[in-house]
Amino acid sequence: MEEKKQVPQIRFKGYVDTWEQRKVSELFRVTRGYVLAATQTETTKTDEKPYPVYSSQTKDQGLMGYYKDYLYEDAITWTTDGANAGTVNYRAGKFYCTNVCGVLLSNEVKANQMIAEALNSVAKGYVSYVGNPKLMNNVMADIVIQIPTQAEEREQLSSFFAKLDNLITLHQRELYKYLRYQILKVRRKS
């Protein structure tokens, strides 16, 4: 990003407008999830418990299980407490999140993958490491990010990042299968 013009060096064709610097609190309503015991969730999605529950863990992108109710839809979450404080994700669809997740709800702009990635690239720098690492709501609200002024450009970037994430996940699964196969092959020889 060029400092003076606020125009990215690389971008999709057809976009020429400058990007703008905005505080998170100007773009979103900042809130957080609610306490939910893990015993109230299921490990797999069921008809009775169809909504994903996200927590502060990194396993399965923070997926703790599934629950009967949802709190939010199409929003950005971040881990507020613990070793993963400052990890930011876009959550498509309806979901529940625990009290160790902050939530950004669409207000001025639509929550999407592009904005989640922009925040994820800077959020760790705002984590307080005094005692238990934390990134509280008031701190997240004051973070300034640069975003395209045009909603269409934000959506195109969001779609690009979502496709890239899906491709990475696919390759990780393939790599896991390959490594598992190789390990089993070596064990059979011994």
Where are the model-predicted features located?
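Feature detects amphipathic, helix-rich regulatory segments
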Residues: 1-190
